[in-house]
Amino acid sequence: MNIIRKILFHKRINTARRISFGFALIILVGALLLMLPISSKERVVTPFLSALFTTTSATCVTGLTLINVGAYFSLFGQAVILFLIQLGGLGFMTILCIVFIVSNRQIGLRNRMLIAQTMGTESLEGIVKLAKHVLHITGIIELLGAIVLSIRFVPKYGFFKGMWFSIFHSVSAFCNAGFDIIGDGKSMLSYRHDPLVLCTLAILVAIGGLGFIVWEDIIAKKSWKRLNVYSKVIIFAQIFFIVVGTFVYFILEYGNINTIGAESVGQKILASFFQSVTTRTAGFDALIQNNLTDLSKAWGTVLMMIGGASGSTAGGVKLGTAVLVIMTLISVLRGKSDVVIHGRRVAHTTILQAMALLVLWLVLVVGGSVLISYIDNQDLINSIYEVASAYSTVGLSVGVSGSASTFTKILLIVYMFFGRVGIMTISVVFMTRIRKTNDIRYPECNFIVG
């Protein structure tokens, strides 16, 4: 324990590395717990790679699995997974604050700056207060979600099992994890015609994907007009992509007999809505993903790339990044040198960061997809869908993970880890380096592009 504390709090180890080490340690300990015979219903030792894949997916709130969680793992094993989901869903920022509070250590200026940058807030004050608020809000919303879900689960499974199912799926939805313990290996397919279950899960996913900063702003301001620019943009973008996503899925899958082609119009809208919400971050599926058209898979990959808001339980390049890239494109097409959102000019360093994150996502996803497609002889579109799902911590699968080689399983583990931890810590390092060199100004040159 002393060795761990020395590594975590060593002065020469920056916050980004502490975060990475902390997440890796949590994943490893979780894997060892899931390997124990008590974690499986058959009381057998779970293979290390399968346990590691599951705990990485849970801690990184992804949802991809090699094992049917509900059918294979015991109550103890499911509880370990739920704990990891909650821990991963709260985010490294909250975990870091909690570690400092529990260890009675003061959060220094440098750590406050890094935490604030990662959270997307401009103020260094109230970081600890915000962490406490996150815990309170999370508990209240997850409890309300569990109560609503119990209306369906308790009558069907009995009180204790029904309440456990309600709690597990409420936490899994709010943390955007997408894990289910129904046990039939079909996620929410058996509830695809149930508006109560699907809408409850979708609302939990959407709220979880807004981010802690937006929640805090809504609670503090209590008025749309008083919200800051970031909160307004994120709320609008969240609604916009859900609506557009629903419409696109409805059109692309309307005549697909293997998905919603044979359903009524109302059921088609419900399924399209749920698919739109869950594809950007959660991983629950009310449709068999492998039965989607190739165009729907391509559209789903775009939604996975966008993800949720910064400081949220969601993955992807983040909503703010997507909005900024779109606004930058519009500004360039209009011949403007500045990007203006709600009467505010966006800093050029922020635009550079957004572009870097987008390019990084594209390079890693395409590179990983080509590798998996070649090694496992998979269709490229399916490989892209699976890798995007892993790197954006979504959890939707077209079956690539289940039939994957050892190399592909390890690669997906790495992608899930860096999708949850790496893309955030890289952004922190990127911002820090820019601030260290922004006092140096070199002569400009005209560089031919396009």
Where are these regions (language model features)?
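Membrane-proximal intracellular helices of multi-pass ion channels
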Residues: 1-450
